[in-house]
Each structure stands twice: as structure tokens, then as C-alpha cells.
Amino acid sequence: YASKTYWIVNYSNPAAIVAKATQILRPNARILNICDMPVEVEARMAEILDTDLSNLEVDYFGLNHYGWFTKVQCNGEDVTEKLKKHVAEYGYVSKASYEDALVKDPDWLHTFTNAKKIVNYFPDYLPNTYWQYYLLGDDIVDYMDINNTRGMQVIHGRETKIREAVKKLENGEKIDLTQFYVGVHGKFIVEVVKALAYDTRSRQLVIVKNDGAVKNLPDDAMVEIPAYITKDGPEPVRVGEIPRFYKGLIEQQDACEGLVVEAVIEGSYKKALQAFTLNRTIPSANVAKEILDEMIEANKEYWVELK
């Protein structure tokens, strides 16, 4: 346990599962769980609106990587419908940067443009981009290359670039440092930490115990919603009730994540299999068992024994 005067800001993944686990294993520690993906989407919204990110205020509900923007305001003006119209046609990509984004990173462009299909199917709200994996799984499988997975892209892309840059610096060579300048994720965590340290009451999207904030979700769910960050922690914004479709999606994923935590704490193979079966990225119990067994073998040096 950390000192009662300290805050632990958890930026690790999978954030939702880590949040649930720490709630159970360290209930008295002051831990604030955060993720930058909603802020990254907000940055794309700001680009579309040709404004600064600081001018936006959003309403949002869900779990980590599993949420929806219900309202977006720019300098106090409600621009939600304007954004929906744009995203339904272009995704989270501004008209001006569409071609440039394709050249820069086709995989990110694919991610941001996938939002247009989701908005056209489910026009109530604006989605977090991670919904592509849960709602458009067949599209993702068709797009992915088994010989060049996302993990491989990170290893051979960003990680290789960083190692090469470090080696050049060690050899006294000059490099272009601008490629490593902080993005919205770095600015986001600084704003959160500043708010905790200096009681700024900054309004941020964070992961907190529900406790009635989303009225028709379980109180112990770790929900991602707006909160005012103070020296004493987050003061969540009350969301109220959410529609049945979104409630059903979230409750299923919340059950999945809760079972993952229970499986690890109890060393339960049964609960791990139940968790995998509930996950929307896995099409059947047969596939869930196959994936679980392969992951157990691949991670036997790191995982607890599941019996």
C-alpha cells in the first residue's frame, strides 16, 4: 500500500482489468486509473472542427476501450450532430488530412475511418475507436495480416525506431527529436497529475467505481466517465440511465473483465474460460477454449496456474 498522502496514477493496460483487480486487491490505496484513447479521439474531433482540444468538453460513458461520446461542446456550443454528420461520412479524419493520413499510417487511418460504419449503424452516440474490434470483428479479421499483426507492427515500427535513435545518440550522432515529441497522451497524464497535486478541478475522462454514476449499471463496475479531478481524487459526473443496447454491451464486457480478475485471484480455469467466452472478439466457446489453452502455454512462466 502507498502512503495515504500519495496518489497512484495507473496508466497500464489492460486498464479496465487492472482497475478491477486493484479495487479488490488494494481497496484502501488511492489509485486513479486512466487511459488516453478517448482523449486521442477528442483530438481528432478538434482537428475536424479546426479548433484546439482545450476548447472541447465531452460527455461520455462506458468501460475502458468500450465507451461512447454522448455530447460534444466546443466553446459551449453543442457540436454533437455536426460531428456525427462528419464521422458518418469520413470517420474521425478531417477532410484536409485524409490523404496525408493514408500516407503517414494506413492502419491508423483504417481505425479512424472504421468509425463511420459504426455511427451509421448506431447513430445515437459517437464511438470510441476500439469498438471496431467488438462490433466489426469480421472486418478486422479480413483486414489484418497474420504475418504482420499489430504487435509485430509495434515491435518493428515504433520500438525499432526508438532503439535505433538511442543507438545513434550513444554514438554521438544527431537525430530528429521532433518525431518523439509528446502527443495528447502525455499532455493528458500531466493534466491529471497537476489536478491531483494542485486541486485544479480539471474535467477529465477517468476510470472510477460506478457507485450509481451510471444509474442502471452495477455499482462495482469500473466505468469510464467525466470527473472533476481534485486533491482528494475524482468527483464523477452523474450520467443517469443509459439505453438498453449500450447497457447490455457494457454489462457483458464488465462480467468478462470481472471473471478475468477472479480467475487470476482464484487460479480458476473455469472462470478464465467463462471470461473468454463472454468476450465479443471471440465467436464461440470452442474458440475461447482453444485461445485460452494456447495463451496458458505461451505464458506459463508469467501466469498463475489455472486449475
Which positions does each model-derived feature cover?
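Internal, well-ordered domain-core segments that constitute the primary functional module
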Residues: Y1-N75
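Long, compositionally biased stretches enriched for glycine and/or charged residues
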Residues: E47-K307
